[in-house]
Amino acid sequence: MQEYLIASIQQALLASGIEPPKEITIEKPSNKQFGDFSTNIALTLAKECRKNPRQLAEEISAKLEFRPETVDKTTIAGPGFINFYLTPAFIMQSVEQVLNEGDQFGKTCTGKGQKAIVEYVSANPTGPLTIGRGRGGVLGDCIANLLESQGYKVTREYYFNDAGRQMTILAESVRLRYLECCGEAIAFPDTHYQGDYISDIAAKLFEKHGVELKEVSQLDEFKQIAETYIFASIKNTLHRLNIHHDSFFNEHKLYQTGQNGKSPNEQVIDALDKAGYISNYDGAVWFTTTKLGQEKDKVLIKSTGEPSYRLPDIAYHVTKYERAFSEIINVFGADHIDEYPDVIEALRILGYDPGRIKVAINQFVTTTVNGETVKMSTRKGNADLLDDLIDDVGADATRLFFIMRSKDSHLNFDVELAKKQSRDNPVFYLQYAHARICSLVKLAEQEIGFTQSDIGVHLMQNLDSPHELQLGLALLDFPEVISSAVRMLEPQKMVEYLHHVAELYHRFYQECPILKAEPDICKARLFLSLATRQVLQNGFRILGVTAPTAM
């Protein structure tokens, strides 16, 4: 509908001798007295046209032409807003599109022929996934689903580092716990991994090898076994949340020598040096960001010879460009806020278009019970573990709670609320709307022999009450909500929208008798219910949650 209104406005502008701008904004007024849709086009063009905004709005409105069955009237409000009032018949007839398109409703070909990569989770295999990583995982998965709904060919990638000091400490931790299983007295350093999962890995080693590895001083075997065990645990946790990846990129590749005799990391250093952005002092190699107006340069290679996080991150992003991704989406935790701008600047210097990169930063998560901050894990040395949260509230509640607040906002995860079986719980409220419709349709089949073939679009003209029209109009918003969520990388917009649809449906269900209504009205209201169920299903699919048929 919004596209239709925009096209009409463009024609009206041309008829008025005004070149239409590239973007025309159509919004839904919060107050229904100002119509079903509104545009500020006269306000945005007034200065350019050297006219009073309200006068310009009247001129544009006079040139607007619509098919008679679509727009009932237009009005001018305030300083120059043009408001559109749709005909009730058009709203309800348009609902047919929802069921005609079914699972495809809301999908577009916007990204057809374009490749997108979404990197998310990317936790190194040093321990179980934490709740904080879980929020980023759900956010990334939903963003990937949104992009796929718009026709993009999406690669879901997990970037990890199985080298470096932390992996060495992991291997040492497992070896010491293994020796403990062998009956040796050990001194376990405070600097090593304290989690019970280390003892679990060591116990499995002992169960398989007995004391055979006691004399093994090399850490490679312990490291490999620990990495395999932890990665299996990570993948299992993600699977529980319906999260998967298409590829796993090992940072180790960035240290391997290529055909030109240099590694990707070395090539980045050479290219930045050639551009004049490398300095060597204090025994380290620096990215000269002071030339970019920053207070300090940023270290790329430490005096120990070990690279900082920035160097492989830059090299890794170069591979994304080389793999011809037109959309590069990074889902990071708040701890990356200070680092990623340097990566963007380096890529710009290297000649890559930074506009192809979009970064979604998700803020921290705290879990609360009865208003008190709690730690989900009871196991020694473990932070708040994602598995423990899933065990407590379930996968659907975990996913939806992670994204029901803006990614830019700190999330207070109310564990008790997530477990409630009442409308206070937004997850229950959403899923109950779907289950309620399923139960209604089943009852209609049993009591009145209802089948979907009974429904004709002409019956929808019988629906004109405010509750019916508001629900019908909301269903038609679904494609635009998806587009907005994609532009903003904000699945929360989907959650808000679906909650609004559920709210409207529950109200419609209470105020508009369905099975007891006259036959034609009954069928029309069942039609509207089925369309609502379809929108909820399509939205749930993008958000990665189930659509229960009974609750």
From Swiss-Prot:
Catalyses:
tRNA(Arg) + L-arginine + ATP = L-arginyl-tRNA(Arg) + AMP + diphosphate
Q: Where is this motif: 'HIGH' region?
A: 123-133
- Report any one BP term from Gene Ontology: arginyl-tRNA aminoacylation
Any single Pfam family the record assigns to this protein = DALR_1
GO CC annotations?
cytoplasm
Q: Which CDD domains match?
A: ArgRS_core
Keywords assigned: Aminoacyl-tRNA synthetase, ATP-binding, Cytoplasm, Ligase, Nucleotide-binding, Protein biosynthesis
Q: Which GO terms describe its molecular function?
A: arginine-tRNA ligase activity; ATP binding
Question: EC top class, in one word?
Answer: ligase
**SMART domains from the xrefs?**
Arg_tRNA_synt_N, DALR_1
Its Enzyme Commission number? 6.1.1.19
InterPro entries associated with the record: Arg-tRNA-ligase (IPR001278), Arg-tRNA-synth_N (IPR005148), Arg-tRNA-synth_N_sf (IPR036695), ArgRS_core (IPR035684), DALR_anticod-bd (IPR008909), Rossmann-like_a/b/a_fold (IPR014729), tRNAsynth_Ia_anticodon-bd (IPR009080)
Q: Where in the cell is it found?
A: Cytoplasm
Q: Which family does it belong to?
A: Belongs to the class-I aminoacyl-tRNA synthetase family.
Assembly and partners are described as: Monomer.
Stated name of the protein: Arginine--tRNA ligase
The species this protein belongs to is: Prosthecochloris aestuarii (strain DSM 271 / SK 413)
